Amino acid sequence: MFNLIRKSTEWGGKTLVLESGKIARQANGAVVVTYGGTTVLSTVVAGKAKEPVDFLPLTVQFVAKSYAVGKIPGGFLKREGKPSDRETLISRLIDRSIRPLFPSGFYDEVSIVCNLLSYDTVTPPEVTALIGATAALAISGVPFNGMVVGARVGYLLSEDKYLLNASADEMLSSSLDLFLSGNKDSVLMVESEASELSESQMLAAISFGHQNCQEVIKLIEEFREESGILPFGFIPHDITSLVDDIASSYTESFSIAYSNIVKKERVLELEKLRDQVLSDMLAKYEQPNGNLQCQYSSQDIISALKSFERSLVRSKIIETSSRIDGRAFNGIRDIEIEIDVLPKTHGSALFTRGNTQALVVTALGTPQDEQIVDDLDGDRRENFLLHYNFPPYAVGESAALRAPGRREIGHGKLAWKAIRYVLPEKSDFPYTIRVVSEITESDGSSSMATVCGASLALMDTGVPIKAPVAGIAMGLIKEGEKFIILSDILGDEDHLGDMDFKVAGTSSGITALQMDMKISGISIEVIEKSLLQAKDGRMHILDKMNLVIQESRECIKNHAPRIESIFINKDKIRNVIGSGGKNIREICEKTGARVEIMQDGTVMIYAINNDAVEYAKNMIMDIVSEPEIGKVFDGTVIEIVKFGAFVSFLGGKRGLIHISEIKNEHINAVGSVISVNDKVKVLVIGIDREYVQLSMRRVDQETGEPIDGELYNIRKTNSDSDDSFLSSGSVNNRHGSEKKRRGSGRSRRSSGGSSYHRDDLHNNGFGNGNRSFNDNRNGNEVPRKPRFF
């Protein structure tokens, strides 16, 4: 029933298995690839284009459903919705890897679906999916020039060791996360994020990955041979004579149009010429009865015109050593930079390079604003977001605004990778950071303008980044063995060239690298020269940026939110929260701040200004702090009794001010001096297992400063005497006669003096003429051990 084909090999320490003939047999090609514990079903279906087109209508979809990791989708429907960003990015990786290998002129619809069936959270699914897509194309009969395989490369800087298809845990210690694809002879695509690595380290990583792809390329070739399926015959439509016809009549006109350095004017001139060529060619080949004289259709004319323009611009660059806008091959367009361009945002920058412009804006939020990502590797939180928007007006088009597409998601992710390494640690800067790049003009390299603008906007915001980051896009014109590398390419140079090579980094090294090809790959030599030329361009751009701002502002804007983190003992978390959340609600209501408490004892305080942050922080510290002898605290009188007053301090702790510690003079009634709800400043003068003894008379009630002459070295004692209310606080354990203490104490109080003798101190902890509570000197009935709570 099944005609099984199976091939396997050991690769990167795991078993790689290709199998076909059992699942999805209605597709042109279907292969189940198992690599380690990850399984992907890749299918290819081809059909005639539904309408005439002059491009390859290739669609690639990577689908990762939650059952692959044994999960049920969240949400009400319990079913997967639109593709996640990760699915979109992997789809782009596969598309960019295989698109250059289809023959020129092949315009049939091709649909590739890579369905992740099982995922072990160790083996990279993008590697498995690309292998499956290539193997499925190889046995589908669709014309396809060569085998392409992808590999994920890591780098352990401390060991100078490169890793092949490492797990997510292993990549945590890696200074590089690079995915590349290549065929037998060359590299086709690179996507990477790095920690300021040098050009030589990046080149070695690319070479390492390409070499390790060869074993799998050989396996896929053997797999195709065993299947016995060959590509169906494809003969591209010959439009050579039509191209020559256009060239003979319009070379000079197009040369003049392409020499216009103003993009808007150049585009208008080229559009007029293209309309004229189409009209002239249709009229030339049309017969009186309306039928075409030969096989040339309007689509043929459009294809021929594109071929002519590509050849014209490329030959001009190579033969005359002159680019479209007259720059040298390594020349950078004029750069204009402004920061703080929007008054009420947390940070902003306007970066203009030639006719490419990015308005980049930052917004700071709290950790509660972090994006929760439901990923196959497990839920995670992102505190750095970068969104790239490319509206139609950026290229002078009239169209409706739509949701971000694959290109916008991909460009935003590249800029995100370029910036992420230089961001501060969350413990040092706990804000959630959102960067939005609005492309307001575009003539090539808008993603790299986003990188430059994001770096500038972050510094304007006051985010303490490690170093400024700049990006540059390189191009390639290759004819035979001759090639020219172009710095800071225009949109037309990107469209008509052979390579889009983007490099971003600091003055110390590369933080992101992306390469896309329009031909069947390039050699390591070309990549090396591109990296070195890109470094010169990156340094030039960084110099321009440094003229405007070299480092982050010392503080964030006044209208930006304030965040402060403090650490408390985990055992105190319940005290801060309070019964039913009472304490935390009270803090938020009184201060206007938001408070978030982590399980490790980290407390995050968010507010609109510093005063609110300090107020909330003080309230929290009051709750978690323990009374300390000799420290002054703010308190509130909560109860008046005959022998003193009870005071709430340190976030709800209760202490007692004995009547003799209220004022430095005799008082008949506590209520005549203080009342309930009075705010007082108190000094802790004694602590034992049951009581906290406080004093008002030893503290200046205006300034909160201890009064000179009223302090002494209080130390805790272990007196077991029932005649003393306190069991700590005295510096002298001598117990003089009651008569002596009473007499000396009265004389001092009546005279208001502040000079004392050590022998006058009783071990009750109040000192300075204070008597034992049981003296009942003021006529108050005081129990030996008053109830305290």
From Swiss-Prot:
HAMAP family: PNPase
Molecular function per GO: 3'-5'-RNA exonuclease activity; magnesium ion binding; polyribonucleotide nucleotidyltransferase activity; RNA binding
EC number per UniProt: 2.7.7.8
Gene: pnp
Keyword terms, alphabetized: Cytoplasm, Magnesium, Metal-binding, Nucleotidyltransferase, RNA-binding, Transferase
Protein name in the entry: Polyribonucleotide nucleotidyltransferase
One GO CC term, this protein: cytosol
UniProt entry tagged with the keyword Metal-binding: yes
Primary location group: cytoplasm
The protein's required cofactors: Mg(2+)
Amino acid composition bias (Basic residues), ranges on this chain: 737-749
Oxidoreductase listed as a keyword: no
Coiled coil regions in record: none
Purpose of the protein: Involved in mRNA degradation. Catalyzes the phosphorolysis of single-stranded polyribonucleotides processively in the 3'- to 5'-direction.
Family matches, as InterPro entries: ExoRNase_PH_dom1 (IPR001247), ExoRNase_PH_dom2 (IPR015847), ExoRNase_PH_dom2_sf (IPR036345), KH_dom (IPR004087), KH_dom_type_1 (IPR004088), KH_dom_type_1_sf (IPR036612), NA-bd_OB-fold (IPR012340), PNPase (IPR012162)
KH domain location: 561-620
Enzyme class of the recorded protein, top EC level: transferase
Pfam families per UniProt: KH_1, PNPase, RNase_PH, RNase_PH_C, S1
Entry-linked SMART domains: KH, S1
Low complexity: bias regions: 763-780
Upper lineage: Bacteria, Pseudomonadati, Pseudomonadota, Alphaproteobacteria, Rickettsiales
Catalytically driven reaction(s): RNA(n+1) + phosphate = RNA(n) + a ribonucleoside 5'-diphosphate
One Gene Ontology term from the biological process aspect of the record: mRNA catabolic process
Domain S1 motif, residue spans: 630-697
Cross-referenced SUPFAM superfamilies: Eukaryotic type KH-domain (KH-domain type I), Nucleic acid-binding proteins, Ribonuclease PH domain 2-like, Ribosomal protein S5 domain 2-like
Residues noted as binding Mg(2+) in the record, renumbered to the chain: 494, 500
Family: Belongs to the polyribonucleotide nucleotidyltransferase family.
Region (Disordered): 709-789
